[in-house]
């Protein structure tokens, strides 16, 4: 009826990868010291006491740089499976991937011209 035995490696990986984080949270909840007070409720900024309000605005160049990084990261995620099966797919998929890369190149040139990649 169900061919679950064909996917036993997948199910084992899924179960193990689900149990390990749950087990880690349970252990940290049991072993962690419980302390409530003003120190526990204060904001934490990379080991440094925050000066003034904790909700500071970052400069826009950080957001633009992160956005450009996410775009190229997603490009890598989409192009890697295509590159792995390049010989199987054919010419039409190659043309689609070429159009995709050209759109990303135009986007990167636009971001470069707008100054999104400069820190000054």
Curated annotation (Swiss-Prot):
- Residues in a coiled coil are none
GO process annotations (BP):
photosynthesis, light reaction
Instruction: Give the catalytic activity.
Output: a plastoquinone + NADH + (n+1) H(+)(in) = a plastoquinol + NAD(+) + n H(+)(out); a plastoquinone + NADPH + (n+1) H(+)(in) = a plastoquinol + NADP(+) + n H(+)(out)
How does the protein's chain sit in the membrane according to the entry? Multi-pass membrane protein
Q: Which GO terms describe its molecular function?
A: NADH dehydrogenase (ubiquinone) activity; quinone binding
Main enzyme class: translocase
Q: Name one GO cellular component term.
A: chloroplast thylakoid membrane
Compartments reported by the entry: Plastid, Chloroplast thylakoid membrane
This protein's major location comes to plastid
Q: What does the protein in this record do?
A: NDH shuttles electrons from NAD(P)H:plastoquinone, via FMN and iron-sulfur (Fe-S) centers, to quinones in the photosynthetic chain and possibly in a chloroplast respiratory chain. The immediate electron acceptor for the enzyme in this species is believed to be plastoquinone. Couples the redox reaction to proton translocation, and thus conserves the redox energy in a proton gradient.
Q: What is this protein called?
A: NAD(P)H-quinone oxidoreductase subunit 3, chloroplastic
Please name the taxonomic classification of the source. Answer: Eukaryota, Viridiplantae, Streptophyta, Embryophyta, Tracheophyta
